[in-house]
A protein has these predicted regions:
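PP2C/PPM-type serine/threonine phosphatase catalytic domain
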Residues: 1-255
Length: 255
């Protein structure tokens, strides 16, 4: 399987700093082509959310350089991958918490990580950044770790009510601000001629699922230039509708 990758980010209308961080890397190995994409949405006082998100991104990048090659040589066993990723989350939860204690600032970050090969994708999720699969239809591959998502699951809110709920952005946990962090894991078989997309919550609040599909479906995402242009068009639509948050989106096109 081959991949085309593209990503873009925008500070948005009101923030002084961009607290989102992302990384997307493609590797060629004996296991075939592999892409690792990670997106983090930081939060914290005095713009220190960017410290939390960048810290976690660097940890995943370091892992991809030093541990991932061995995992690939061993056949990318799912339990071994989750063990590595759990260690990254645990270590950096403590690291960011300690930084916060030293500086007197509360900070933390969400994270969605996607590792995709020709035969399998693996996703880690903490918080409300998301992963989508866009093919003949659009599907959310992650579950938000938020108060409103929990309320929807319990039948106390409808999805439409959740979009207007003042608790919409209240997280159940995040890396650096929780005593312990339990990531959610998802995996599946990647589809050819599909788009795998990661986004921060600022990207999706002001646009509909139908609009995401209209701009980011595989027929519209034929090369990296088209991909970036279409993602930027949706970001501009977000801003026209007065989205106040930072906005980040990463796309991986399979073929």
């Amino acid at each position: 399987m081959e991949f085309i990758i593209s990503a873009t980010t925008d500070i948005g209308l009101t923030k002084n700093t961009n607290q989102d961080s992302f990384s997307v890397r493609q590797f060629r190995s004996n296991y075939g082509n592999v892409v690792l994409a990670v997106l983090c949405d930081g939060m914290g006082g005095l713009a220190k959310g960017e410290v939390a998100s960048a810290t976690l991104i660097r940890a995943f990048e370091k892992w991809s350089e030093h541990q991932l090659p061995q995992l690939l040589r061993n056949g990318l066993e799912e339990q071994a991958l989750q063990r590595d990723w759990n260690q990254i989350i645990t270590e950096n939860n403590e690291k960011i918490k300690n930084y916060g204690k030293q500086t007197g600032i509360n900070l933390g970050t969400t994270v969605t990580a996607l590792l995709i090969t020709g035969t399998r994708y693996h996703i880690l999720n903490v918080g409300d950044t998301r992963a989508y699969e866009i093919a003949d239809h659009i599907q959310v591959l992650t579950q938000d770790q938020t108060v409103v998502a929990q309320e929807i699951a319990c039948g106390r809110l409808t999805p439409e009510e959740a979009e207007r709920d003042p608790r919409r952005s209240v997280l159940l946990q995040c890396v650096g601000a929780s005593e312990t962090v339990q990531p959610d894991y998802f995996s599946g078989i990647p589809r050819q001629n599909a788009v795998y997309m990661l986004c921060s919550d600022g990207f999706r609040h002001q646009i509909s699922t139908e609009e995401i599909y209209q701009y980011l479906n595989p027929a519209c995402m034929t090369d990296s230039e088209c991909m970036k242009k279409n993602m930027e068009a949706l970001i501009e639509l977000d801003k026209q509708r007065q989205e106040r948050d930072n906005i980040t989106v990463v796309s991986i096109r399979t073929y």
